[in-house]
Swiss-Prot record:
The organism's place on the tree of life at top rank: Bacteria
Name of this chain's protein: Rubredoxin
Binding-site residues for Fe cation, renumbered to this chain: 20, 23, 53, 56
Record PANTHER family: RUBREDOXIN, RUBREDOXIN-1-RELATED
């Protein structure tokens, strides 16, 4: 019996963004790069070899893959578990957690004001 290759997460399957290590510019394939006339939908690997960072001029080898911006983490078959939280991206989960903490803080602050 042959072993199956390891499954990839949804973030790994998505077209990854690439960040310039020199200046922090993020190349997002779905947006392309208007400054250098790269059309939207062009993956990073398909960029010309002489393409440079539009902000600082760093070569392509200064870029690292950072994954998709709003891709949910985890595997596709697990997205329906966890009251829908598995479908949230990391940023949305952070907003939910810290937003809830802020509301709780305001609640306790209002109790303090009543006393």
């Amino acid at each position: 019996m042959s072993e199956r290759p390891p499954e990839k997460t949804l973030a790994e399957l998505a077209s990854p963004n690439h960040e310039c290590r020199a200046c922090g510019y993020v190349y997002i394939p779905s947006q392309g790069d208007q400054k250098t006339s790269v059309s939207p939908g062009t993956p990073f690997e398909a960029l010309p070899l002489n393409w440079k960072c539009p902000v600082c001029g760093a070569p392509r080898n200064y870029f690292i893959s950072t994954g998709e911006t709003d891709a949910p983490s985890g595997f596709a078959e697990n997205l329906n578990y966890g009251f829908g939280f598995n479908r949230m991206s990391g940023g949305k989960k952070n907003l939910l957690i810290f937003g809830s903490l802020f509301v709780i803080f305001l609640f306790f602050l209002s109790l303090y004001g009543m006393g």
